[in-house]
């Protein structure tokens, strides 16, 4: 099960807009940029994992764990554009640790509905 196309941020222009106009929150493993988007009624997700973190297998493992976390919480996330950037410590974490760390930083970024979390 994938996140549908409508839930993804792919265009460089969208990434740049969110970097400039969005708000950032970080912990040791992730940086999360959020930006309101009134044109859509659901969240959109962009993931950035630098080549400095490791080979393609490792980077894809991190991206899969991030996407899985958003799939699990899909109905509880506000309609925002969200970019998740993985930092160096994320490469040594298990999938469960990645999900716990990501949930922590997403709560700080206030992307969850108040009634759900």
Swiss-Prot record:
The keyword Nuclease applies. Its EC number is 3.1.26.5. InterPro entries: Ribosomal_Su5_D2-typ_SF (IPR020568), Ribsml_uS5_D2-typ_fold_subgr (IPR014721), RNase_P (IPR000100), RNase_P_CS (IPR020539). It is an enzyme of class 3 (hydrolase). Keywords: Endonuclease, Hydrolase, Nuclease, RNA-binding, tRNA processing. It comes from the Bacteria. Pfam families: Ribonuclease_P. GO terms for cellular component: ribonuclease P complex. It catalyses: Endonucleolytic cleavage of RNA, removing 5'-extranucleotides from tRNA precursor. GO terms for biological process: tRNA 5'-leader removal. Belongs to the RnpA family. Consists of a catalytic RNA component (M1 or rnpB) and a protein subunit. RNaseP catalyzes the removal of the 5'-leader sequence from pre-tRNA to produce the mature 5'-terminus. It can also cleave other RNA substrates such as 4.5S RNA. The protein component plays an auxiliary but essential role in vivo by binding to the 5'-leader sequence and broadening the substrate specificity of the ribozyme. This is Ribonuclease P protein component.
């Amino acid at each position: 099960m994938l996140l549908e196309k409508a839930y993804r941020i792919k265009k460089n222009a969208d990434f740049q807009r969110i970097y400039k106009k969005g708000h950032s929150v970080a912990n040791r493993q992730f940086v999360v940029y959020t930006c309101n988007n009134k044109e859509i009624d659901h969240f959109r997700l962009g993931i950035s994992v630098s080549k400095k973190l490791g080979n393609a297998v490792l980077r894809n493992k991190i991206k899969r764990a991030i996407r899985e976390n958003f799939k699990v919480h899909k109905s509880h996330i506000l309609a925002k554009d969200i970019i998740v950037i993985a930092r160096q410590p994320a490469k040594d974490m298990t999938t469960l640790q990645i999900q716990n760390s990501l949930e922590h930083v997403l709560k700080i970024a206030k992307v969850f509905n108040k009634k759900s979390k």
